[in-house]
Every structure is written in structure tokens, then in C-alpha cells.
From Swiss-Prot:
PROSITE patterns, per database record: AA_TRNA_LIGASE_II
Taxonomic lineage: Bacteria, Bacillati, Actinomycetota, Actinomycetes, Mycobacteriales
Keywords: Aminoacyl-tRNA synthetase, ATP-binding, Cytoplasm, Ligase, Nucleotide-binding, Protein biosynthesis
Gene3D superfamilies (UniProt xref): Anticodon-binding domain, Bira Bifunctional Protein, Domain 2
Organism the protein comes from: Corynebacterium glutamicum (strain ATCC 13032 / DSM 20300 / JCM 1318 / BCRC 11384 / CCUG 27702 / LMG 3730 / NBRC 12168 / NCIMB 10025 / NRRL B-2784 / 534)
GO biological process, one term: histidyl-tRNA aminoacylation
Assembly notes: Homodimer.
The protein's Enzyme Commission number: 6.1.1.21
Name recorded for this polypeptide: Histidine--tRNA ligase
NCBIfam families: hisS
Enzyme category, top tier: ligase
Length: 429
């Protein structure tokens, strides 16, 4: 009876919210490998890290990302804080970076300002493979120089970031979205085309606010209706066309392969001129693994100088899926250099001091806890993949020695307690 009662009173456990993935070991090793590879490539290219708030004033994204986008109109996590201020969990990184550049006057120094960031972003989407409500990204932004060579550098950096992981079966899609000089005429032509179609009310409203958004509609019936829509790439003015041709020429010179996709429309309103996306067909419908573009009017739109900028965001989650699709393994299995096995209370006290000294010396060290006995503790040593295992029992304490087991060579050395740190340093450092 008491057993049944205890079962009924058992507290309910919890699961992660829908669409929010955990990366527990061993998968966390792959997560760190992908994220760190992206960050390291950015640092090698002269980008400095910036740490951004997880939430911002809602107006920043409404004005910066664009109210006609699905991101702002449907996907943002927005709430009122205790001071009744409207704040939003960041759905993307560029607007926050631009806000920080303006706020801290980073644009008053040497240009371009080159910044990189990494972390979680939040969008209320329908969860499926590769589409999460908390997504992990690494991004870069280069602000203050209107130079197509910078566009090419950014694109090549993203390409190199993927290849540094061993990813191969992806493609770079590229286009130009024009600028404030040539886009208005194209916008009118596109609206004239769209308003002649039997669009539903929501799509028609989108065409009124930003007709490019309609070309980004993934519904088959809308894609079929817009198959013959006029394209921005055919309506570039001379300056934008020269800019785009310079970018593609530089990519050719750098050996970065690409395909031109004149129908590409990124999901954010601030893009101008160069726009690009990296696609991996092994992911099915959610094939985009990263992308970016130029945003020449964004800083002024957010209250700063009228400076140009270009950047990208690389999806860590989707890149992990792409690597899995190609059968590429990244992330070394967790391993410590040394694993300590104490046998008895006195041994545990002595070994704790040795473990602490080894860690201070830069040697990664773990230790067996609980009274598991030699057999159980050695199983822990095997699971740790340690290179060396230290066994300290009563006999070793009496002899003032410790057994050092070489787990690869299957050899054992009896070493004086006061010499074991130096002995292991000689083997490992």
C-alpha cells in the first residue's frame, strides 16, 4: 500500500520545451567543434568578439528587421517586462550588433568595424528537423566600408568556415537585391505584376508593404503564380551591376564556387546589393545552413551614421545535421589525461591534493568518487578515456608511492608520491 502511495505521489518530471534542443554528451562535443571552428575562422580574419544581450527593445527588431517579415510579424518571442517595457528575445544578430556599434561609438574609430558573435537566437517556428525555436548561430559583421572586395572576403570566409569542418556537399547561391536608387522602379514593376494575380488577402497585404516578401513565399501555389515575376537582377542600375560583377569576379579569383540565383530573397528586409545563402540538399526542406548579405541603409535606419555593412549568420544546428548527412564526424570524444582511483578514506584525502596539483599544472584530471572499490573505479577510468590512471591504496600509502597505469601501453609504474606530478608532466607536457 505504501509503495503504491509513493508511486502516485512521485513528482512530475520535465522535458525541454518543444523545439528547443539539448546538446548533451557526446553530441555536445560536435556542437562545440562546429561553433568553435566558425569562431576561430572569424578571428583569423581579424574579427573581434562582441557579446550581445539575449533580449532587446522590441522596436529595434521591428524597425531593423522589417515589420513585413515573418520574423517580426509571426515568429518573435515578445513580452512586457515588470516595467511594462516591450522586449524581445533576439531573433537574429545584425540589428543588435548595429545597436551596439552606435551606442558605443565603435563607428568613430578605424573602419571597417569587424565584429563576430555566437549564441542562441529565438523564433517561434513550427519545429521540425533543422528548424528550432532556439537556434544556435555564429555571425560576423563588417561595418563602415562600401567595397565589393569586403563582400567577397565575407563570403569566402563563410565558405572556408564550412570547409574547415570537412563539409563538402554544399553550394553557395548568390544574387543582388539592388539599392535605394534602383529598387523603387523594380518594386513598382513587381507590385504591378503581383496585383494582377489572384492573391489571398494576407499575401496581397504583404505585396503592398514589401513585394519581395511574396517571392520568398514557400507555398507551391504562390511559387507557381510568381514563376514569371520580374527579377531584381534584371533591373540593377549601372553601379549595382558593377558592384555585383566585381564581387563575382573576386570570388572567381579566390576559387570560391557559386551559382547565381536571381529568385533568392532573404527573410530580412534590410538587405541591399549582395545577398547570399549556403545550401545543403542533405537537409531536405530546411536546406539553408547559413547566409547573409549587405545592408547599406540599416545603421541610418537605427539612428546612426549612414554607413554600409555586410555580414552573415552560420547555423550551428543545421551545420551539425549537414555533417551527419555526409557522414563527417567532428568533435573529439571527451578525454582526460589522468584519472585518480583512491582506495580508502586516507587515500582519497591524499589523492585529492595530487589531483588539484595536476590540474593547477595544466593536466586535465578526474577522480573516482564514492566507495566503488577497485573494479568499479577502473570502469570509470576506462569510460574517461584517460591516458594514465593513478591508483592509491593502503599499501601504496605505507610505501609513500602511487601506482601509475599507462592505459595505452598497459604498463604500470610505481612512483614516489612527491614525484608523481613531475613524472606525469614529463609524460604529458
Amino acid at each position: 500500500m505504501s509503495q503504491n502511495k509513493s508511486k502516485s505521489e512521485k513528482l512530475q518530471s520535465f522535458a525541454a520545451p518543444k523545439g528547443v534542443p539539448d546538446y548533451a554528451p557526446p553530441k555536445s562535443a560536435a556542437f562545440l567543434a562546429v561553433r568553435d571552428a566558425f569562431v576561430n575562422q572569424a578571428h583569423k580574419a581579424g574579427f573581434e568578439h562582441i557579446e550581445l544581450p539575449i533580449f532587446e527593445d522590441t522596436g529595434l527588431f521591428a524597425r531593423g528587421v522589417g515589420e513585413s517579415t515573418d520574423v517580426v510579424s509571426k515568429e518573435m518571442y515578445t513580452f512586457a517586462d515588470r516595467g511594462e517595457r516591450s522586449v524581445t528575445l533576439r531573433p537574429e544578430g545584425t540589428a543588435g550588433v548595429m545597436r551596439a556599434v552606435i551606442e558605443h561609438s565603435l563607428d568613430r574609430g578605424q573602419l571597417p568595424v569587424k565584429l563576430n558573435y555566437a549564441g542562441p537566437f529565438f523564433r517561434y517556428e513550427r519545429p521540425q528537423a533543422g528548424r528550432y525555436r532556439q537556434l544556435q548561430q555564429v555571425g560576423v559583421e563588417a561595418i563602415g566600408v562600401d567595397d565589393p572586395a569586403l563582400d567577397a572576403e565575407i563570403i569566402a570566409l563563410a565558405d572556408r568556415s564550412y570547409r574547415s569542418l570537412g563539409l563538402q556537399d554544399f553550394r553557395l547561391e548568390l544574387t543582388s537585391l539592388g539599392d535605394r536608387h534602383c529598387r523603387p522602379e523594380y518594386r513598382q514593376k513587381l507590385q504591378d505584376f503581383l496585383f494582377a494575380l489572384p492573391l489571398d488577402e494576407e499575401t496581397r497585404k504583404r505585396a503592398e508593404i514589401n513585394p519581395l516578401r511574396v517571392l520568398d513565399d514557400k507555398r507551391p501555389e504562390v511559387q507557381e503564380m510568381t514563376a514569371d515575376a520580374p527579377l531584381m537582377l534584371d533591373h540593377l542600375d549601372a553601379e549595382c551591376r558593377e558592384h555585383f560583377e566585381t564581387v563575382t569576379g573576386l570570388l572567381d579569383d579566390m576559387g570560391v564556387p557559386y551559382v547565381i540565383n536571381p529568385r533568392m530573397v532573404r527573410g530580412l528586409d534590410y538587405y541591399t546589393k549582395t545577398c547570399f545563402e549556403f545550401v545543403h540538399d542533405g537537409l531536405g526542406a530546411q536546406s539553408g545552413i547559413g547566409g547573409g548579405g549587405r545592408y547599406d541603409g540599416l545603421m541610418a535606419q537605427l539612428g546612426g551614421q549612414d554607413l554600409s555593412g555586410i555580414g552573415y549568420g552560420l547555423g550551428v544546428d543545421r551545420t551539425m545535421l549537414a555533417l551527419e548527412a555526409e557522414g563527417v564526424t567532428v568533435g573529439a570524444e571527451r578525454r582526460v589525461d589522468v584519472y585518480g582511483v583512491p582506495l580508502g578514506k586516507d587515500a582519497k584525502k591524499a589523492l585529492a591534493g595530487i589531483v588539484n596539483t595536476l590540474r593547477a599544472a595544466g593536466i586535465s584530471t578526474d577522480m573516482s568518487y564514492g566507495d566503488r572499490g577497485l573494479k568499479g573505479a577502473m570502469k570509470g577510468a576506462d569510460r574517461s578515456n584517460a591516458l594514465y590512471t593513478l591508483v592509491l591504496g593502503e599499501q601504496e600509502l605505507e610505501n609513500n608511492t602511487i601506482a601509475v597505469k599507462d592505459m595505452r601501453a598497459h604498463e604500470q609504474h610505481d612512483v614516489a608520491l612527491d614525484e608523481v606530478v613531475a613524472f606525469l608532466q614529463g609524460k604529458l607536457i
